[in-house]
Amino acid sequence: MIGYMAKLKVLEVIRQGQIGGGESHLLDLIYFLDREKVEPVCLSFTDGEMIRRLTRMGIVCHIINSQKPFDIKVQGQIIKLIQNEHIQLVNAHGSRAASNILYPVRKLHIPLIYTVHGWSFHDDQSYIVRKLRGWSEKIICSSANQIICVSESNKVTGIKVFGLKNAIVIENGVNLDKFNPDGSFKYLRSEFGFSESDFIVGFIARCTKQKNPLVFLAALEKSHHVHPSIKGLFVGEGDMDGEVDAYIQQHQMKGYLFRSSFRTDVPDLLHCIDVYCLPSLWEGLSIALLEAMAMRKAIIATPTDGTKEVIEHQKNGLVVQFDDVPALAKSIGVFYENKVMKEECANQAWKFVTERFNAKRVAESVSTIYSEIMNNGG
């Protein structure tokens, strides 16, 4: 193993350069790491906005193109990268990134941390797929020096499914300086065609099966037909773009829904909505959800692993069951009709997040893990 130096050189590995929850976590982690102690280097398997932001921060970034887990073709490139950059420790974010780093770290005797942003197995998969994913997660976890789960529920699920060991929980955090509801924001309602009196429900997430965008659209449609001033803001892109665009066109929603691809002005977007909706099928602990809570927004979400730990029904948000369009539409209507309840839930959500989920605290906790692993000889 490469000798330990005063400043620890850590390779942060992630599957994609586009910004999702894991990528937001990594951006904040690197931003708040003490650069006097840790020198982060990033490896992503695709390009994207995250890479551009990290580069502007002065972080050395590498892109090795791969769309597959356990990709044999990229192993040699990863080994050379680790050697050339004199990497001492690897933190792999997510299962695909971890699967592609297993052989290189083992060959080079580099300690590995696996940060779980949500397991790759979930209930909507077939029995065989779920079993195979559980098996692959077990292989990854058994090869890591330390597993970091971003929610207690993720840890419990791992223990239940494949006997997870050597795991600690460091909950996701939010950059509370950036996501401050009392800050100054660009007024976007006029840009999106909304009036001040419109009641805006926001979906700001990747356009993928995981986030369940069609359920959001169906619920918004029902809500709008009951209360025409209920309108929607849909921001995000992904492999369901075609299905989403087709649904919007077929159901003639353009008059009350603004659809946008990925945007970087998330605090401004959150500032302009009344309710944040996240009907996901699975989550670790959604950073987007925490950001909306930090911006003092009323929340409607499904009871995924991490969400169950932060949203208490009718206290700091509303919880609806998976794929339940009528219940989601009803919840939107509840917040529309009961503004006092909406504001109370929003205030409680803000209070909960600001007291517990600070991204600076996350970086300090992760940095402590880095030091402990190196001090224990990897």
Identify what each model region corresponds to.
Residues G20-D28, F199, F203-H225, D239-D245, ...:
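A conserved mid-protein helix/loop that constitutes part of the nucleotide-sugar donor-binding site
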Residues L43-S44, A298-A301, I311:
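Short hydrophobic beta-strand element within catalytic cores of glycosyltransferases
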Residues T55-I59, K155-L176, P181:
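Helix-loop-beta element that forms the nucleotide-linked donor phosphate-binding surface
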Residues A92-A98, V116:
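Short His-centered aromatic/hydrophobic patch
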Residues D245-S261:
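Nucleotide-activated donor-binding/catalytic signature segment of Leloir-type glycosyltransferases, i.e.
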Residues F262, L281:
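Aromatic "clamp/platform" in nucleotide-sugar-dependent glycosyltransferases that forms part
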Residues H313-Q314, L318-V325, V334-K339:
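Conserved acidic donor-binding segment of nucleotide-sugar-dependent glycosyltransferases
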